[in-house]
Amino acid sequence: QDLPPLDPSAEQAQALNYVKDTAEAADHPAHQEGEQCDNCMFFQADSQGCQLFPQNSVEPAGWCQSWTAQN
């Protein structure tokens, strides 16, 4: 299933400071080097989806402040 890409200017994206490129978040206090969507527990590789944004896909190299390490 193809999900429409999440627009960083969308309200829910802005609420979590989502960016398409993790480098854009380097100055965010919660950001740590190496964190990006494709190594987050909420990322769904088969659809490039995210459990936090169920109606959209996210960039694998993106980031948001809810990033959580995969177990």
Swiss-Prot record:
Keyword terms: 4Fe-4S, Electron transport, Iron, Iron-sulfur, Metal-binding, Pyrrolidone carboxylic acid, Transport
Pfam families, per the entry: HIPIP
Gene Ontology biological process: aerobic electron transport chain
Transport is among the record's keywords: yes
Domain of life: Bacteria
Modified residues (Pyrrolidone carboxylic acid): 1
InterPro entries: High_potential_FeS_prot (IPR000170), HIPIP_sf (IPR036369)
Binding sites annotated in the UniProt record for [4Fe-4S] cluster: 37, 40, 50, 64
GO molecular function: 4 iron, 4 sulfur cluster binding; electron transfer activity; metal ion binding
Subunit relationships: Homodimer.
Family designation: Belongs to the high-potential iron-sulfur protein (HiPIP) family.
UniProt function note: Specific class of high-redox-potential 4Fe-4S ferredoxins. Functions in anaerobic electron transport in most purple and in some other photosynthetic bacteria and in at least one genus (Paracoccus) of halophilic, denitrifying bacteria.
The name this protein goes by in its record: High-potential iron-sulfur protein
Provenance organism: Halomonas halodenitrificans (strain ATCC 12084 / NCIMB 8669)
Lineage: Bacteria, Pseudomonadati, Pseudomonadota, Gammaproteobacteria, Oceanospirillales
Gene: hip
